[in-house]
Amino acid sequence: MKPLTPRQQQVFDLIKSKIEDTGMPPTRAEIARELGFRSANAAEEHLKALARKQAIEIIPGASRGIRILLEDAANDDQGLPLIGQVAAGEPILAQEHVESHYQVDPAMFKPKADFLLRVNGESMKDIGIMDGDLLAVHKTQDVRDGQVVVARVDDDVTVKRLERKGSTVLLHAENEEFSPIQVDLTSQHLTIEGLAVGIIRNTDWM
């Protein structure tokens, strides 16, 4: 998570406090009222700034659609978080998705890894990404064509090789038995969750 301004830290701390006390994040109006903002729009601007700094993720269309992301996950003494099943509509680094932590140095990957994702299936086996492997992922949306990415298409998370063609994105498997996933950006929602930076073989932890 990038450093926050004092005001942004106030908003972030309020969100955490509300979730801990009530189980729900605050609405924009509640943030504005408790922190003395002139309007809910002012609260929204601070939320957008927090989202840009990867402190939170905003879920569109919900008055309480705020999720706190892992704080400095890759620097945590617990190790790299292993992300399990990702619930529809929720950010991949939401706390509830963390199955466990592995004592792996993030700096052994270039760029450094922020989290691990368990590979499900054999669509990328031809480049050595096997079912059950732990995929090391650098959280970024700055990716190039030809790179292997973790992508969310609507509510499904997948690992594929990226190719952009205008308003269409092709997500290619590395297994001839799998056809490319074609994403029409005019009607479908695509989010790049990160860049694949390495593999930990599933037998390494047995």
UniProtKB/Swiss-Prot annotation:
One of its GO terms (biological process) is SOS response. The keyword Glycoprotein does not apply. Belongs to the peptidase S24 family. Residues 28-48 bind DNA. SUPFAM superfamilies: LexA/Signal peptidase, Winged helix' DNA-binding domain. Its EC number is 3.4.21.88. This is LexA repressor. It comes from the Bacteria. It catalyses: Hydrolysis of Ala-|-Gly bond in repressor LexA. Gene3D superfamilies: Umud Fragment, subunit A, Winged helix-like DNA-binding domain superfamily/Winged helix DNA-binding domain. Homodimer. The keyword DNA damage applies. InterPro entries: LexA (IPR006200), LexA-like (IPR039418), LexA/Signal_pep-like_sf (IPR036286), LexA_DNA-bd_dom (IPR006199), LexA_repressor (IPR050077), Peptidase_S24_LexA (IPR006197), Peptidase_S24_S26A/B/C (IPR015927), WH-like_DNA-bd_sf (IPR036388). The active site is at residues 123, 160. Keywords: Autocatalytic cleavage, DNA damage, DNA repair, DNA replication, DNA-binding, Hydrolase, Repressor, SOS response, Transcription, Transcription regulation. Represses a number of genes involved in the response to DNA damage (SOS response), including recA and lexA. In the presence of single-stranded DNA, RecA interacts with LexA causing an autocatalytic cleavage which disrupts the DNA-binding part of LexA, leading to derepression of the SOS regulon and eventually DNA repair. The record marks 88-89 as: Cleavage. GO terms for molecular function: DNA binding; serine-type endopeptidase activity. The lineage of its organism: Bacteria, Pseudomonadati, Pseudomonadota, Gammaproteobacteria, Vibrionales. PANTHER family: LEXA REPRESSOR, LEXA REPRESSOR-RELATED. Pfam families: LexA_DNA_bind (PF01726), Peptidase_S24 (PF00717).
